[in-house]
Amino acid sequence: MIKPVLKMGDPCLLQPARRVDQFGTPELEALLQDMQDTMAALNGAGLAAPQIGVSLQVVIFGVEHSPRYPDAESVPFTVLINPVLTPLTEQMEEDWEGCLSIPGMRGLVPRYTRLRYQGVDAAGASIDRTVTGFHARVVQHECDHLNGILYPMRINDLRKFGYTDTLFPGQTIADD
């Protein structure tokens, strides 16, 4: 079921999410289906459970040849629960980000260029991946939601944060 996405300013988005302790439950399966339906309906690159009002450490993400990210490499669809991120470099790169919880806006956000993420999938099986580039950026963005962090909190220069139609006049860039 498609759920409404909470917007920046909602206190639920600023709270740390709780760990998932039980796997294979009807409640977890329903949450994951709702998240997938919502992300697909909004053409998102990812979605965190807190964005639909559920304070659990659950994120989903995945991008395949999206017109919204024409230059981005594909990111395999992933369900990631109770994630732990470990930067594998001190090198950071700034790039433009948007968010379904902050429609119509973009900001230049620094992110680690290479990291390892670990967690579990919907069945409780271990996930352990090392990623770079856009994949690393998407994982960091989604996992920030689990710690009550929205991307504007990471921006170094607020002159590089604004409305999409003002920052990129004449370009068609969908809301994230």
Swiss-Prot record:
Catalytic activity: N-terminal N-formyl-L-methionyl-[peptide] + H2O = N-terminal L-methionyl-[peptide] + formate
Keyword Protein biosynthesis annotated: yes
UniProt superkingdom: Bacteria
Binding site for Fe cation: 99, 141, 145
Active site, per annotation: 142
Needed co-factor(s): Fe(2+)
Top EC group: hydrolase
MF (Gene Ontology): metal ion binding; peptide deformylase activity
GO biological process: co-translational protein modification; translation
Pfam family, one: Pep_deformylase
CDD domains per UniProt: Pep_deformylase (cd00487)
EC number from the UniProt entry: 3.5.1.88
Cofactor binding note: Binds 1 Fe(2+) ion.
Record PANTHER family: PEPTIDE DEFORMYLASE, PEPTIDE DEFORMYLASE 1
NCBIfam families: pept_deformyl (TIGR00079), PRK00150.1-3 (NF001159)
Role noted for this protein: Removes the formyl group from the N-terminal Met of newly synthesized proteins. Requires at least a dipeptide for an efficient rate of reaction. N-terminal L-methionine is a prerequisite for activity but the enzyme has broad specificity at other positions.
Family: Belongs to the polypeptide deformylase family.
Listed name of the protein: Peptide deformylase 1
Protein's organism: Nitrosomonas europaea (strain ATCC 19718 / CIP 103999 / KCTC 2705 / NBRC 14298)
